[in-house]
Amino acid sequence: MTLIEDARKGVVTDFVKKAAEYEGIEAEKLIRLISHGYVVLPKNVRREEVQPRAIGMLTSTKVNANVGTSADYINVEEEVEKAIIAQKAGADAVMDLSSGGDLDAIRKRIMEVVEVPFGTVPIYQAARDCHRVVDMDEDDFFRVVEKHAKDGVDFMTIHAGVNWVSVERLRRSKRLLGVVSRGGAITIGWMLHNEKENPYYKDFDYLLEILKEYDVTISLGDAYRPGCIHDAGDRAKYTEFIMLGELVEKCREKGVQCMVEGPGHVPLDQIETSVRAMKSVTDNAPLYLLGPLVTDIAAGYDHIAAAIGAAIAGMAGADFICYVTPSEHLALPTVEDVREGVIAAKIAAHAIDLIKEGQRERARQRDYEMSLARKNLDWERQFELSIDPEKAREIYSRRKSESEACSMCGDLCAIKLVKEAFERD
């Protein structure tokens, strides 16, 4: 019995109770949302301890951090440190996207330090295990999914929405960058070389059988996410939206939790349309977005471009933000890049929660308490309430004022001046 099937029977497990407490909502309300597929609560049956993180309607906006090796840079312990730092900075989930080294050993090592939901993209390993990507057979697509499920992976990105219809849309498109999704590119390359349908799409029911056995949440990958502003909102992307909506229905029918992934690079004026379209065609499935990045020229600062897009997407209904680091488009991120990426995404997530139904009051209470601390010039309380207490404290201490205010205004602190004026009046 999967968690979504339990929810449909009204069963409130201890795990659900903990998740509801974390979200500040009633457990009965949470299981209703899970039962409809509006919220997912990822947890593989083989993982004993996972901090509950509900994703979707009425729940707080969550942040995912990607870690993992590349073929050019394999330092497992650095990736472990990234996973630790990401969680310390507030990441609600961690994904291992390793593509270099002993992928089984790396995945298991990173999982040892991850306490929140843990995700992977299995096709990366399937591709690495073969001499050439196109040499995979159809069974390879599924064997690797089962391997990850047995290892305890809580959620997996699988590009099941790619099929011949969408490939033909891509072929006729005027895209500048084509496909920028690694999983999508692997799948499309395999299809074109072997002249066969995507196994994940063709045998989706079989895929769901594997996932259901371990209660793995499927994250339906967006192979056609736009990789630049020029490519945003084209027919290939919307074709995939529709396919993903149909797959969401199948997931719910089979009792498998699912969420849907989205773009990408999107200009500000298209974000709301894109998000609302995805929410509509997927019947309010939890929406997991990479950014979206609102410009292509922010190299070195793409975490900021992504946070801007994420905040706007959250206003329209996005539920889960995949962080972007300053190294995006440039290099494998460092530990510090990971921390900065999580912080930027957490700022966007909190900004979303300030207006999100079910979370607004709780989120605004924190801002209210910060304002009180500023009114009282209570610096320790301000540090405590900050997204990044360590950095706030370090900056304040860098140039201290002789007054109780900060060194920006010193004895001309506006709050202090007006307060003292009223006290003298």
UniProtKB/Swiss-Prot annotation:
Instruction: Identify the keywords attached in UniProt to this record, alphabetized.
Output: 4Fe-4S, Iron, Iron-sulfur, Lyase, Metal-binding, S-adenosyl-L-methionine, Thiamine biosynthesis, Zinc
Reaction catalyzed: 5-amino-1-(5-phospho-beta-D-ribosyl)imidazole + S-adenosyl-L-methionine = 4-amino-2-methyl-5-(phosphooxymethyl)pyrimidine + CO + 5'-deoxyadenosine + formate + L-methionine + 3 H(+)
Short name of one Pfam family: ThiC_Rad_SAM
* Positions bound to substrate: N66, M95, Y124, H159, S181, R182, G183, D222, A223, Y224, R225, E261, Y288
Question: Record-annotated residues binding Zn(2+)?
Answer: H265, H329
Q: In which pathway does it act?
A: Cofactor biosynthesis; thiamine diphosphate biosynthesis
| Keyword Metal-binding recorded | yes
Give the enzyme's main class according to its UniProt record, as a single word: lyase
Residue positions annotated to bind [4Fe-4S] cluster are C406, C409, C413
- Matches recorded under NCBIfam families: PRK13352.1, thiC
Q: What is the protein's given name?
A: Phosphomethylpyrimidine synthase
